[in-house]
Amino acid sequence: MSAAPTTAPVAAVSKKGKKSGDTINSKLALTMKSGKYVLGYKSTLKTLRSGKAKLILIAANAPPLRKSELEYYAMLSRCSVHHYSGNNIDLGTACGKLFRVGVLAVIDAGDSDILAA
């Protein structure tokens, strides 16, 4: 009687979260090339107050008080909010910048369909 090791088939790891991150990154890169946007907390607040922002992206490690303030202004200006899954370094890299980006506001998406996300 041979005691061959039996292993249960390993389920493939789902990369659903990674895939959605990739799509938002590619849409964001297209927005950076063809659309209008502002980077940073103060500039985003100004665009939210003026009602020009269509979408705001907030990095995962943004301070909670800033997050809630941005969400409040977005609610007042009827702007959608996307909580980016990565930190501010990842968001800066996704924007094609060599610096950290905590918050960005999309004013005009250009050729990208990021507003549908």
From Swiss-Prot:
There are 2 genes for eL30 in S.pombe. InterPro entries: Ribosomal_eL30-like, Ribosomal_eL30-like_sf, Ribosomal_eL30_CS, Ribosomal_eL8/eL30/eS12/Gad45. Residues 1-14 have a biased composition (Low complexity). This is Large ribosomal subunit protein eL30B. GO terms for cellular component: cytosol; cytosolic large ribosomal subunit; preribosome. It comes from Schizosaccharomyces pombe (strain 972 / ATCC 24843). Component of the ribosome, a large ribonucleoprotein complex responsible for the synthesis of proteins in the cell. The small ribosomal subunit (SSU) binds messenger RNAs (mRNAs) and translates the encoded message by selecting cognate aminoacyl-transfer RNA (tRNA) molecules. The large subunit (LSU) contains the ribosomal catalytic site termed the peptidyl transferase center (PTC), which catalyzes the formation of peptide bonds, thereby polymerizing the amino acids delivered by tRNAs into a polypeptide chain. It comes from the Eukaryota. Residues 1-22 are annotated as: Disordered.
